[in-house]
Regions:
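Conserved GNAT acetyl-CoA-binding A-motif
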Residues: 101-114
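Conserved active-site alpha-helix within GNAT-family acetyltransferase domains
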Residues: 115-141
Length: 165
């Protein structure tokens, strides 16, 4: 994790699917399809065009992570390139999605967390809902969280507009 005294080495920003889908697809293909073995037909579910998306960029402009918020308040497809994990990128992406959810009027968000990263989501205020289940061949747990306290843009966000689709 980056100490508070060090400047962030990345930014996170909302993006339009139509303008950035090749970049979003490349990140997700690398993390989910190649690294985790998710079948491509499950990864590309047809919901991206109407979702809110964010991308994390290294300061040199390299895309390093992404996530999305669906119109039903479901957060998903949170992916960080392996070399950037453990440096606050995933946390910043999630925080950005929570602020977007709050600003769009969602009181509560939900997600399906891979069981190996449950603690990451617990630290961000998510609560487990129900038993483990398999999704795309990976063990998951449903989780929910209020967005009421998520009103300030994360430090990694350089602007103020929210993009969708």
């Amino acid at each position: 994790m980056t100490p508070a005294s060090e400047p962030l080495q990345f930014t996170v920003q909302p993006v339009y699917w139509t303008a950035t889908q090749l970049v979003l697809r490349a990140i997700r293909a690398k993390v989910f399809v190649e690294e985790q073995g998710v079948p491509p037909d499950l990864e590309w579910d047809g919901l991206d065009e109407h979702a809110y998306h964010v991308i994390a960029y290294a300061l040199d402009g390299t895309p390093i992570g992404t996530g999305r918020l669906l119109q039903d308040g479901h957060i998903g497809r949170l992916a960080v390139i392996m070399e950037w994990r453990g440096r606050g990128v995933g946390r910043s992406i999630l925080d950005m999605l929570l602020v977007i959810a709050n600003k769009m009027g969602y009181d509560m968000v939900k997600l399906h967390a891979q069981t190996r990263v449950l603690e990451f989501y617990r630290r961000r205020g998510f609560e487990r809902q129900g038993k483990e289940f398999m999704e795309a061949g990976i063990s998951h747990v449903a989780m929910t969280r209020s967005t009421a306290d998520q009103t300030v843009w994360p430090a990694a966000f350089p602007g103020g507009n929210v993009a969708r689709g």
